[in-house]
Every structure is written in C-alpha cells, then in structure tokens.
Amino acid sequence: MDFDAVLLLSFGGPEGPEQVRPFLENVTRGRGVPPERLDHVAEHYLHFGGVSPINGINRALIEQLRAAQDLPVYFGNRNWEPYVEDTVKVMRDNGIRRAAVFTTSAWSGYSSCTQYVEDIARARTAAGTGAPELVKLRPYFDHPLFVEMFAGAIADAAAKVPAGARLVFTAHSVPVAADERLGPRLYSRQVAYAARLVAAAAGYAEHDLVWQSRSGPPQVRWLEPDVADHLRALAESGTRAVIVCPIGFVADHIEVVWDLDEELRAQAESAGMLMARASTPNAQPRFARLAADLIDELRCGRTPARVTGPDPVPGCLASVNGAPCRPPHCAAQATG
C-alpha cells in the first residue's frame, strides 16, 4: 500500500487561558457534564498557565517523524486547533491522495480507537470531493519500541528511589460497561498485557495495575482500583517508595502532569512515601521510529512487529476512511 503523506491525529489541548473553557466544552459536548465540573477541571489547566503540554509535544514529535521517514507530515486534532477537519481540507487542496494516520493512543476502545475512526470519517465528509483516503494505523501497545521506551523510563525512575520500590502502572479509567462491550474487556486486557510485557522487560517480577482520572456520576462503575486508593493502601501496608508508570499515556497529558505529578505526588509526600514518575514517550526519536515502522508494515506488507508474552491480547487492524476496524471490536463498541 502506497502513501503520499502522514497525518498525526491527536486529542488537542488549549494553548492559553482564554482557550481552556471552550476546549473543555468541545471535549464534553453532549455528555451532560455540569458547568461546575468544567470549572474544576479548568483549574488544572490554569495551574499551567492555561497551556496543555500536548500540542507542543506533538509538534516536536512531528519533526522527529519527518526525520524518520520520507513522507510529509500533517497535524490534526479532535478537540482543538488545528482541527482535523481543517487539516484534511488542506491535504485535499495539496493533492494528497492517501495518507497513513498515526494516532497518539496505543489502544483499542471507544475513546482510544473508535472515536479517532469517527474523526477520520467526519473529516473526510467535511472535505468532500477529492478528500484523501485515510488509513488509520493499528494500535501499538505490543510494539517492541513501545515496550522498550516504557521499560527504559522505569529504569530511569528507579534510580531516583530506593531499591525495592513498588512498581505501579496506571492508565485512564473508563466505564466498566464500555470496557465490557469490547471482546470483552479488550481495553483493560490490552493495558494489563502491555504492563506485563514492560515489567518483564524492566526486570520486575511483580507489579500493580491501577486506573486514574475517572469522571462522571458516582453511580456509574468505572475500572478500579483507583490510583489514589491504591497508593493509600500501599502506604498503610508499609510501602515507602513507588515507581508510577503512566503506561496508558504516550505523552504528558494534563492527566499526567496534574493528576500524577501534582495530586498523587502530594498524596505520597503526605503519607511519607517517595514517588518517582516514569516518563512517557513524548517526542522521543524512538516514538517516531515506532510510527514509521507501523507505516512500513502497510507499505511493505510486513508482518506486524510485536512483543509476545503469555496470554496475548488481540488488537484492531488498520481502518480505512472511517470504516470499523478489524477484528470488529471497534464496530461492537460503536453499535453496542
């Protein structure tokens, strides 16, 4: 399969105080989130001057990706400028015929896969006649470079705390009902599998997997245990040092720099615990090489590069022009 461009498709984030509330309204539109909840979350962004780190990280990653392969790279977001609809129109006007779409999410699931597929379909519709074919690349939670980057980050974090620190992986929680529609529990199983692969690569025989940043009504069940509850339990059991690895995030979203670096670290300090947070891939050259390798899998018809371990978990395959991924996990999520 030939490509003449790459589209980096991401979540988006505000880049100034005046953009915070409109951005959050975009993210939560149609979900019935009360205004006071938006006000609360807005304070997290305003703590950093109203600037999410994600757009700057993605621009740096794009420069790395341009150096790692020979195709032009475009940038589009779901929830803030540059909006993917506008970017695809530019691609159309530039004569792009088929582009590989690399998303900043490693997983299957609605918000991590299906919603990006919907973004692609919506953007092509907005572009109309002459819109390029858009091929979303597969999830990459088991790619060798994904495992290598997080294993290396854990080693770096371990150097900052005493030997024997407890290794705790964390990822974004989702409603249990949403997770169970996929396979079942495809998202949570993928995260657990990737955590096992990374822990083994980093030389850890034991680790914990917890969830973070849940939202929504308290009566709705979300994936547990929550990271704050787990840290409290560790402290009560006598644990004095932890390494927190945000394996669910490939970049420093606000859920990383606020929920972990600010809130969780303060909780650890108040409990007398040392905490080291493993870095995310962000704009590492290896992350760009991972994206380039996914592109080459389709360009050259290569067998996907995967790290294998006990009880492997399936993932979606490439999706073309917003069609449901195969196997039909994302289709089940979209229609469930």
Swiss-Prot record:
- What SUPFAM superfamilies has UniProt attached to this entry? Chelatase
Keyword tRNA processing among UniProt keywords: no
Q: GO:BP terms for this protein?
A: heme biosynthetic process
Q: Gene Ontology terms, cellular component aspect? A: cytoplasm
Q: One Pfam family this chain carries?
A: Ferrochelatase
Binding sites annotated in the UniProt record for Fe-coproporphyrin III: S52, Y116
Name the job this protein performs. Involved in coproporphyrin-dependent heme b biosynthesis. Catalyzes the insertion of ferrous iron into coproporphyrin III to form Fe-coproporphyrin III.
Q: Please give the name of this protein.
A: Coproporphyrin III ferrochelatase
**Lineage, top ranks:** Bacteria, Bacillati, Actinomycetota, Actinomycetes, Mycobacteriales
